[in-house]
Amino acid sequence: MEELPATAIGLKVNDGIVLASERRLSYGGYVLSKQAKKVHKIGKFLMAGAGIYGDLQTLTRIMNVEIKYYEISTGKPISVHAAAKLLSVILYQYKVMPFISEILFGGVDEKGPQLYVLDPIGSLIEDNYAAVGSGARIAIGVLESEYDPNMNLDIAAQLITKAIKASIERDITSGDGIDLAIMDKKGNYENKFIPY
């Protein structure tokens, strides 16, 4: 499979999770938009991705509805793992005509911060940090050299920003600013935009 345009990065530390992506929306050598948000809050979860932008938007809408449906029908909140597994099943259902996307999905529950990586057909992998998209090869080197699960969320946000900036410098399909989503271990959420 060809690399999917964009760069998205996720990082799990003891204090929470951070997801980030750049904002460029491009196909081939053409930049369609410089304002494409690829990091979303879905209920109490965070999701970021690389790939076909319409597919990412559709998956975000589907997950919003499915999570609400689960919680209404069961009367209890869905766990991070169960929500990630739900996304995995949704992706697998479309394996013949897949969503062209690589997804980072995370959140915090009673088991602590969790980060999952999903491919277009629903493979589900839990990890401490991950990068997807065309800038992933560049970003992962930055993450591997400096990642520490004991770093605080501010340092984690700085590291993820550094990794995205490195990708923007070398990947033509990444650029136009950085969206950061931060969730601490209590579930508090913060969203930031960093011009770059």
From Swiss-Prot:
Family: Belongs to the peptidase T1B family.
UniProt note on regulation of activity: The formation of the proteasomal ATPase PAN-20S proteasome complex, via the docking of the C-termini of PAN into the intersubunit pockets in the alpha-rings, triggers opening of the gate for substrate entry. Interconversion between the open-gate and close-gate conformations leads to a dynamic regulation of the 20S proteasome proteolysis activity.
Chief location of this protein within or outside the cell: cytoplasm
Cytoplasm keyword on record: yes
Reactions performed catalytically: Cleavage of peptide bonds with very broad specificity
One Pfam match: Proteasome
Active site annotation, chain numbering: 7 (nucleophile)
Alphabetized GO MF terms: threonine-type endopeptidase activity
Any Gene Ontology CC annotation: cytoplasm
Record-linked PROSITE patterns: PROTEASOME_BETA_1 (PS00854), PROTEASOME_BETA_2 (PS51476)
Subunit field text: The 20S proteasome core is composed of 14 alpha and 14 beta subunits that assemble into four stacked heptameric rings, resulting in a barrel-shaped structure. The two inner rings, each composed of seven catalytic beta subunits, are sandwiched by two outer rings, each composed of seven alpha subunits. The catalytic chamber with the active sites is on the inside of the barrel. Has a gated structure, the ends of the cylinder being occluded by the N-termini of the alpha-subunits. Is capped at one or both ends by the proteasome regulatory ATPase, PAN.
Name of protein: Proteasome subunit beta 2
Alphabetized UniProt keyword annotations: Autocatalytic cleavage, Cytoplasm, Hydrolase, Protease, Proteasome, Threonine protease, Zymogen
The protein's Enzyme Commission number: 3.4.25.1
Protease in keyword set: yes
Function: Component of the proteasome core, a large protease complex with broad specificity involved in protein degradation.
Subcellular location: Cytoplasm
SUPFAM superfamilies recorded: N-terminal nucleophile aminohydrolases (Ntn hydrolases)
Gene: psmB2
Source organism, top-level taxon: Archaea
GO biological process: proteasomal protein catabolic process
Propeptide section residues: 1-6
